[in-house]
Amino acid sequence: QFALRTVTRPGDAVALESPTYFNLIPLCERLGLRTIEVPTHPGSGMSMDALEMLLAEKRVAAVVCMPNVHNPLGTSMPLEAKRRLAALANEYRVPVIEDALYAELQYATPLQPAVKAFDSDGWVILCASYSKTLAPGFRVGWMEAGRFQREVADLKFCSSVSQPAVVCEALGAFLESGAYEQHLRRLRRTYAGQIDRLRGLIDDAFPAGTRA
């Protein structure tokens, strides 16, 4: 929400993946934003050709996407598409809001980089959180906002001066100890095992040719 409020104004249009996270469109509506859906495929991610047409026509004020561990597709955008997305943001000077809430739960080794890794001019705003990897109740996240860092910080300060100090201190100590990385490795193994079991059940119970 902070990222959208920073780079858009009521009446602006934003480009979203289709399908996308179910609550993103209502959020945009509450902010007075119009949404334009961009076709998104599990194998290739958001259509860069379709997005470039929108950008060339100057129809959108921002792009919102989930390149790694997409919700609801569960897939990640190919590396070349990420490079192209970062290049388009720089070329057309349009902010890309990268939702990385699930990115640390990737099963690929090594982990796939964020679009932000290819951002040469600060147009990509990377948003992440510990609510999906540690505890939903923490409600603690972070942003790497590039050229918009100051505006985001000012907006956050006006909205809420700080997060709960005890939670932040405990989380900081957990990160510094190295235990977080161990926790992530266990979590990835657990989820990967659950997916394998689910696929096995689908293979056993569904008609031949069913893909999961």
Where are these regions (language model features)?
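A generic "structured core" feature
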Residues: 26, 85-87, 96, 196-197, ...
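Conserved PLP-dependent catalytic core of the aminotransferase class-I/II
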Residues: 184-210
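Hydrophobic residues in beta-strands of the RecA-like P-loop NTPase core, especially within AAA+ ATPase
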Residues: 16, 97-98
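Conserved core of the PLP fold type I
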Residues: 1-92, 103-121, 191
